[in-house]
């Protein structure tokens, strides 16, 4: 069969830099071989439809500071572009691109009528605060909240002016929250403009705030049920105690798991008899960190990764488990990817060889996307869901995904590879149906 020449480096040439090696493309390439999808078709699925760069000027004490931001619209074959807004000092076009691609795969795996997109805002709050602190009257955290509001108002204005309402549907992500989503609603008065809105705002969804953490815990409980192990018989360590990590800890504890170690950016705590998760959540809510919760029993990320536990839950940032540290990983049973792409492709292969199961990010942290789908439809149609209905819907979706992965796991090679196969097949079929490939 004739296969046209594929310009696989077209985006790289345009932005004058090479896309770093990443797991999602490697997995998709392997899936394409198993599914017998051509290189030309895969190129159309892998690469983004468009990306937008936007400078966001904000004034601080009479000086203008320009903040860089970007939106990657990856794929809308199955529905509107969907994905969060990440605010961090290391945001870049390639990370945003891979996160958008992961959203495309995640929504396809969950069989949602949504596509994939992502926004990134590159800002170093500590650096800017240090630059202006002699002139400022606020402490660090109030300054960050004020600056973030100014940045987001600029971002929202450009979002609306570019006609992206209902084309790209934002949501909270690392560095953003319901507070930032409210600004979209304030500007548009459209309950379906974003998901993850604050409680009480038109179109808000009960259970959306904790959905990703609940989904993470439920995915782990589902796996334990599959292998015939009681939650009370396993120990868990969690990296990250933001919205995802804290709620994952809460629900895992509620299901009966023993949470023995938790870390965040500034510190960590280790209680071999089990951490009081509710007390830790109260502490973190007040201090914005878990540091200081128990100064006598602390732990750092490196030590926690090496400690012997049944389940490790990376719930913070990406690429934290790689070829350099995976051999020293202490998890005996499972790594559950609550964060996006926390395990590199090389580490994935090595852990697979060692018999350590990985539940993929596109499954484990899909609770936010599943709940967002309900919130978006609620905003469009005016129907209302209770928290119990939202969680019941999520459980059903997670059950369906797990059974779909399990059905082809042996053929694909792992849960991670099975998830990639399912998502790619659905995307390919949708794009063929719409004559996009």
Model-derived features: where do they sit?
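Flexible, glycine/charged-enriched surface loops at secondary-structure junctions
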Residues: 39-44, 111-112, 165-172, 228-235, ...
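Rossmann-like adenosine-cofactor binding region
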Residues: 267-359
